[in-house]
UniProtKB/Swiss-Prot annotation:
Binding site for substrate: S253
Family (UniProt): Belongs to the ketol-acid reductoisomerase family.
GO molecular function, a single term: NADP binding
Residues covered by the KARI C-terminal knotted domain: 184-329
Gene name per UniProt: ilvC
Reported cofactor(s): Mg(2+)
Name of the protein in its database record: Ketol-acid reductoisomerase (NADP(+))
Positions annotated to bind NADP(+): Y26, G27, S28, Q29, R49, S52, S54, D84, T85, S86, Q87, G135
GO cellular component: cytosol
Biological classification of the source: Bacteria, Bacillati, Actinomycetota, Actinomycetes, Mycobacteriales
Reaction(s) the record says it catalyses: (2R)-2,3-dihydroxy-3-methylbutanoate + NADP(+) = (2S)-2-acetolactate + NADPH + H(+); (2R,3R)-2,3-dihydroxy-3-methylpentanoate + NADP(+) = (S)-2-ethyl-2-hydroxy-3-oxobutanoate + NADPH + H(+)
Protein residues bound to Mg(2+) 2: D192, E228, E232
Length: 337
């Protein structure tokens, strides 16, 4: 099924230029949205919680900085870019009491709307603008006269102008230069969570660790296992990123290509696919989200326990030693924000 793709010529920039936009949060996406919107002629203010470490950065960038409630009262378009697990509380305490008829509430990810943690009144436009790249890339591409593709969606449209508003917003942050793709809150939320859990984070992490363990348990040095199962992954991912799986297979040796074809299906087989379907089902029916919410309400205890157990793996200790030998490798864990 072909998808629609919209560009700058399809968007009316004056729509968002005629609104007052509050960006709630000034992290990776927040700073990029705010600066790109401002340079596209949009009036922008930043909403931050009291005591936020981001206040100084936002003020140094020349933005009017308000608390979340003040920003919500001032604006008629509110883009909520705080972490998923904080959004419901911010909405309940600061945004909802200040929403006015005709206001629009936008998101960069659909989780809280799709699973009902946030339920605005019927007179509020609910939309999403989700660049498919990190904030620093969204900003850099905009400055270079380019853009990052964006997804847009409208969940509630009492005024009938939700898509035009979302498209205008997407164009103002540079998305229309690359392409704006309409979707739904359900599709964006489910596919995003599934990709993270089954492939990008959960699946990849377990594949790396298990490969490392197999080699070490067979008597090979942990350093050799680290190089072959983790370090070289970037080379492969870069090739896939640049030109797809076909490009990767074209670029590696015939030995690697042949071995991948005959052994890959032994690692990821029909049983794996069935378990992935189970993960998808848990996302679709809300099982995962209930567990996520319970973790937050429990003070992140489960997350902290999982994090500690995973961080204690031998592969982490091995990597710390080996990365000290690599002057070209940045270790963000040792950098200060």
């Amino acid at each position: 099924m072909a998808i629609d793709v919209f560009y700058d010529d399809d968007a009316d920039l004056s729509i968002i230029q005629g609104r007052k936009v509050a960006i709630i949060g000034y992290g990776s996406q927040g700073h990029a949205h705010a600066q790109n919107l401002r340079e596209s002629g949009v009036e922008v203010a930043i909403g931050l919680r009291e005591g936020s470490k981001s206040r100084e950065k936002a003020e140094e960038a020349g933005f009017k900085v308000l608390n979340n409630a003040e920003a919500s009262e001032w604006a008629d378009v509110i883009m909520l870019l705080a972490p998923d697990t904080s959004q419901a509380q911010i909405y309940e305490n600061d945004i909802a009491p200040n929403l006015k008829d005709g206001d629009a509430l936008f998101f960069g990810h659909g989780l809280n709307i799709h699973f009902g943690m946030i339920k605005p009144e019927d007179n509020i436009t609910i939309g999403m603008v989700a660049p498919k790249g990190p904030g620093h890339l969204v900003r850099r591409q905009y400055v270079d006269g380019k853009g990052v593709p964006c997804l847009i969606a409208v969940e509630q449209d009492p005024k009938g102008n939700g898509r035009d508003l979302a498209l205008s917003y997407a164009a103002a942050i540079g998305g229309g230069r690359a392409g704006v793709i309409p979707t739904t809150f359900e599709a964006e939320t489910v596919t995003d969570l599934f990709g993270e859990q089954a492939v990008l984070c959960g699946g990849t992490e377990e594949l790396i660790k298990t490969g490392f363990e197999v080699l070490v348990e067979a008597g090979y040095e942990p350093e050799m296992a680290y190089f072959e199962c983790l370090h070289e992954l970037k080379l492969i991912v870069d090739l896939i990123f640049e030109g797809g799986i076909k490009n990767m297979n074209y670029s590696v040796s015939d030995t690697a290509e042949f071995g991948g074809y005959i052994s890959g299906p032994r690692v990821i087989d029909a049983d794996t696919k069935e378990r992935m379907k189970g993960i998808l089902s848990d996302i679709q029916d809300g099982t995962f989200t209930k567990r996520l919410v319970a973790n937050v309400e429990g003070g992140n205890k489960e997350l902290e326990e999982l994090r500690a157990s995973y961080n204690d793996h031998e592969i982490e200790k091995t990597g710390e030693k080996l990365r000290d030998l690599m002057s070209w490798v940045k270790n963000p864990l040792n950098e200060t924000a």
